[in-house]
């Protein structure tokens, strides 16, 4: 029987319903929606599928423990009780980051040190070694203290999920890819939609809308931290990547158009669309929609204006 993991996917406030629907599509179990996050359970296949497919999640975290801690001893003991040796190899590199809010243990650096010491002691005991070289794969550990309750996480994503791999450069103040994806969903973008952005910048809104319309998984062009985790085997990643490729809607009639007064931004948007795999569904043009409405298609009855 496969191990059932508890996962937490943070998201922008107000986009929880969109992320909830995405998680349901993965076949996850025991889904719980709270402000700014969606928690769910699944096997190693769901870890891979979530990272590859979730458009509006900021990252996918494994929730390893939840417990009360008002002293450093309680913080240490709760962390030590996690079976770290089943998750991390003896040579794992495991930096620790965290936060504390409205808790008696308010010093984040001190808490980081305690969590790190607990993991070190448990790994040395579990692997029966005297030293931990930390020269292997990277396992990012996170903790969150909220009102004296600790949550310990293992980050399966690595870089945030907004980093799709297609936006090598951006204009000033670009919209985050995960937020753009949520806007596309809330705007009810479909496979036959015509989406236009009159102030496209580097093209993120149109590109995310195109990927949604084509059901093109956002994570196909990048790698994830959990691809190096022993408990998420390579064959699971290969299977989930192939599944995502098989589900692309190649017959979608989507069309995306973006306008901007900056030629450099338009060139960048076209380049990003090609890198994102939707260059044949999107085009970006230099235009000032305040003056050139007749030369654009902003009055089309099938248009979704993104801003």
Q: What is each model feature region?
A:
Residues 2-25, 32-33, 38-56, 106-109, ...:
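S-adenosyl-L-methionine
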Residues 14, 263-264, 304:
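Short alpha-helical
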Residues 298-307:
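Single conserved hydrophobic/aromatic residue that forms the stacking wall/gate
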Residues 99-101, 161-166, 248-250:
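Short glycine/proline-rich turn/loop motifs
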Residues 291-295:
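Short conserved loop adjoining the S-adenosyl-L-methionine
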């Amino acid at each position: 029987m496969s191990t059932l993991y508890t996962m937490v996917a943070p998201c922008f406030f107000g986009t929880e319903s969109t992320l909830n629907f995405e998680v349901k599509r993965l076949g996850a179990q025991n889904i719980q929606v709270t402000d700014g996050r969606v928690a769910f359970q699944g096997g190693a296949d769901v870890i891979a599928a979530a990272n590859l497919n979730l458009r509006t999640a900021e990252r996918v975290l494994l929730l390893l423990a939840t417990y009360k801690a008002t002293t450093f001893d309680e913080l240490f003991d709760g962390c030590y009780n996690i079976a770290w040796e089943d998750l991390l190899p003896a040579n794992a590199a495991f930096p620790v980051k965290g936060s504390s809010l409205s808790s008696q243990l308010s010093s984040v650096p001190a808490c980081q040190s305690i969590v790190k010491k607990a993991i070190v002691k448990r790994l040395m005991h579990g692997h029966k070694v005297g030293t931990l070289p930390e020269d292997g794969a990277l396992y990012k550990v996170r903790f969150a203290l909220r009102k004296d309750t600790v949550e310990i996480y293992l980050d399966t994503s690595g870089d945030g999920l907004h980093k799709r791999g297609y936006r090598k450069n951006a204009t000033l103040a670009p919209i985050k890819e995960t937020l753009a994806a949520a806007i596309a969903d809330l705007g009810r973008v479909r496979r036959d939609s015509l989406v236009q952005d009159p102030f496209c910048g580097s093209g993120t809104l149109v590109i995310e809308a195109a990927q949604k319309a084509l059901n093109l998984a956002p994570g196909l062009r990048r790698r994830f931290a959990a691809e190096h985790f022993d408990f998420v085997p390579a064959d699971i990643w290969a299977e989930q990547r192939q599944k995502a490729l098989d589900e692309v809607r190649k017959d979608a009639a989507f069309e995306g158009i973006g306008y901007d007064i900056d030629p450099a931004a338009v060139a960048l948007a076209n380049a990003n669309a090609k890198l994102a795999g939707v260059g044949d569904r999107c085009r970006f043009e230099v235009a000032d929609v305040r003056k050139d409405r007749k030369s654009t298609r902003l009055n089309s009855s099938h248009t979704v204006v993104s801003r």
